[in-house]
Amino acid sequence: MRVRELAEWLGATFEGDGEREVVRAASLESAGATDLGFVGSRKAAEQGLASAAGCLIVPPEFPNPAARTIIRACEPRTAFARAVGRLHPAAAAEPGVHPTAVVAESAEIGSGVAIGPHSSVGEGARIGARTRIGAGCAIGRRVRLGEECTLHANVTVYDDCDIGARGILHSGCVIGADGFGFAMAGDRYEKFPQIGRVAIGDDCEIGANTCIDRAALGVTWIGEGTKLDNLVQVGHNCRIGRHVVVAAQTGFSGGVVVEDYAVIGGQVGIGDKARIGTHAVLGSGCGVLTSKIVHAGQVVWGTPARPLKEYLEQLASLRRLPEMRQELAEFRRRLEELESADRRRE
């Protein structure tokens, strides 16, 4: 693709050789004459100028003293992501049902759907047009998949769950397993039936081996545009808002509410019925206690989660703890000497 065409497609401007062909995206370290590179910040500018990439996508203020071929974009990361998708389109699956797949007679299969080997689709399921279902997937009864979804190999969607249009579910994820609910009867636990479901909005992406449990009653909800990384656990009756991002190995206990546009780091633990406000940021490894409220726009870290400034102050004090212990021991020694001297004078 020519640089001129790519810039026009991105709605950006270019400088340099507009007729230069770029055929793939590459890192700055490995890029060659026909590769497209990316400079996202001023810090990377020097590396970008030294790169052998045939073309660079850069921010508007990028210096270009060597008159390199560049594409200036107001949002360079977004522009580069779109360019990567254009230069490296996903392989199209041939529509149709593999001979080893099992599809219930009452299932509704949209046009252009591809169902891979050894997959199953249950009674009353509805599969939207142009959806791709990989090998070994299990789609339960009355499941609804929107248009243009992609289910990679070995995804399981339990009965009665809904997944919106253009959803991406990576290998091994499980949607709609029973929530962790039990009642103590005498000296033993009895299972609390989990009769709710899971509903996932449009344009969501669910990482590999992530599990989203069905509600005990009602709905476990994932809002549109939300992205969950690998190995995330969402407990029963959680309500995750729109355009929330969650990094790997994070766990949501039952009944947690996360409002729109929150950012949650990796290995975060969130207790029952906690509430995370819109645009809040939870740092990696922090712990939010049961029923705790993290207010809108707040940045928290540590366990128990607390405002970042407070956490950093406490961390700085903690690092000085060995020194402070020595100082305290010295103060005690000197105090004892003074007290001993006073007693002798008496």
Regions flagged by a language model, labelled:
Residues 1-100, 161, 166, 172-173, ...:
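Terminal amphipathic alpha-helical/low-complexity segments used for targeting or macromolecular assembly
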Residues 38, 96-307:
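Structural signal for interior beta-strand "rungs" in well-ordered beta-sheet cores
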